[in-house]
A protein has these predicted regions:
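Long, hydrophobic/aromatic-enriched structural stretches that serve as scaffold segments
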Residues: 87-172
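Extracellular loop and loop/strand-boundary signature of outer-membrane beta-barrel proteins
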Residues: 54-55, 121-126, 184-190, 228, ...
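Outer membrane beta-barrel transmembrane domains
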Residues: 116-118, 243-356
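Short glycine/proline- and aromatic-enriched beta-strand/turn motifs that initiate or cap beta-hairpins
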Residues: 29-77, 108, 113-118, 288-294, ...
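Transmembrane beta-barrel strands of outer-membrane/channel proteins
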Residues: 44-50, 104-112, 158-164, 204, ...
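Residues that define the transmembrane beta-barrel architecture of outer-membrane proteins
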Residues: 61-67, 130-134, 154, 194-200, ...
Length: 356
């Protein structure tokens, strides 16, 4: 009964999200013309993360591929329990602040994980399991305005999906390899078992006047710190970090998106007729309590490895915007995630966003 009730509520919420994209009153979508108000539009994005982008070789290892398509509504009025959730005052920094804007988001995502050796059909006990994760993400985003502390972006996210053969990792990876003429991964018979996945994540990013753009060699420099907490049978962790941006005219937004784990910014960006760009570098540290792709299934015995509880990501990237489009690329260096891992991982994240 509880599972049926939860599924019914999630179905209603998803229907509400889709309906809202097409029925948001015009009063919440002010005309922008050629101005640079960033948050009056609705936004969409498609994103690909792959180790090919970082290694420039036709190989697969560990987190090898991620796909995501997402939508973020224009500002809307929320009421009832959605409004209550969106305005929860999580501590730290919200003194003398008020919610200025609410958005809802919907994303479809797929991630694939493999061991280092994908040629073997045997169970590789010292290497990470094969696994895939297909899920829908429902997002409540709130911008808080504070006279003294700037702008805060809070995002509550619920991920609902499935890990295991039902997620289609073998089908996606091997059919793609057939298409491009690459070797198939042979060990998918050893993958994680089917398991429903549920994760709840809270993210906060700060755009503080204390970190407002300063000048360096004629360019602007600023920082955006953030924190994240995730709880679920797929991933449980606490994290924090930030990015430093460098460019001719830094936009008043929160940077490009990323596929979890790892805090991204937002699909929302500055819409302007002028071409703009910036470079960024960042770091994120996570304390990991659970990772199903290392710990194995929660409800069944499965292949697992001894995970590391402290993981860090280093990032370098670039963003370009023109009119209602944004293109970003992020190179991620991720420290070792389990005890028998031979070397750190690298992958690239390419995202194309658009405003409408």
């Amino acid at each position: 009964m509880p599972l049926f009730f939860f599924s019914r509520q999630m179905t209603r919420f998803a229907a509400f999200l889709v309906f809202s994209f097409f029925t948001t009153p015009a009063v919440y979508a002010e005309e922008t013309g050629t101005s640079e108000k960033p948050f009056r539009w609705a936004f969409g994005a498609v994103q690909v993360e792959n180790d090919l982008f970082a290694n420039f070789a036709n190989t697969d290892r560990h987190y090898t591929n991620g796909l995501q398509a997402s939508l973020l509504s224009n500002p809307i009025a929320l009421s009832g329990w959605l409004g209550e959730v969106a305005t929860i005052r999580v501590p730290f920094g919200l003194a003398d602040s008020a919610p200025a804007e609410h958005r809802i988001g919907l994303a479809l995502s797929h991630s694939i994980f493999t061991p280092d050796d994908t040629s073997s059909t045997a169970l590789l006990t010292n290497d990470r399991p094969y696994g895939a994760w297909a899920h829908i993400t429902l997002t409540l985003q709130t911008l808080w305005k504070s006279r003294g502390n700037g702008t805060f972006q809070d995002q509550w996210k619920i991920d609902v999906g499935v890990v295991g053969p039902a997620a289609g990792g073998k089908f996606v990876q091997n059919n793609w390899h057939k298409l491009i003429g690459a070797d198939e991964a042979n060990g998918w018979s050893n993958q994680l078992h089917n398991e429903p996945g549920l994760n709840v994540t809270f993210e906060r990013a700060w755009n503080s006047p204390d970190l407002a753009p300063s000048q360096l060699a004629g360019f602007e420099v600023n920082g955006i710190p953030y924190a994240v907490a995730a709880l679920g049978n797929v991933q449980t962790y606490l994290g924090g970090g930030g990015i430093v941006r460098f460019g001719p005219d830094l936009p008043d937004d929160f940077g490009p998106t990323r596929i979890n784990p790892g805090v991204g910014g937002s699909e929302a960006f500055i819409v302007s007729d002028a071409f703009n760009w910036y470079l960024f570098a960042g770091v994120e540290a996570r304390v990991v309590g659970r990772d199903i792709f290392l710990d194995g299934n929660l409800f069944n015995d499965s292949h697992s490895v001894d995970k590391r509880h402290f993981v860090s990501d280093l990032r370098l990237g670039a963003v370009a915007t023109w009119q209602n489009a944004r293109l970003s690329f992020t190179h991620v260096y991720r420290t070792k995630e389990y005890s028998t891992q031979t070397k750190a991982d690298q992958f690239g994240s390419l995202a194309l966003g658009f405003a409408f």
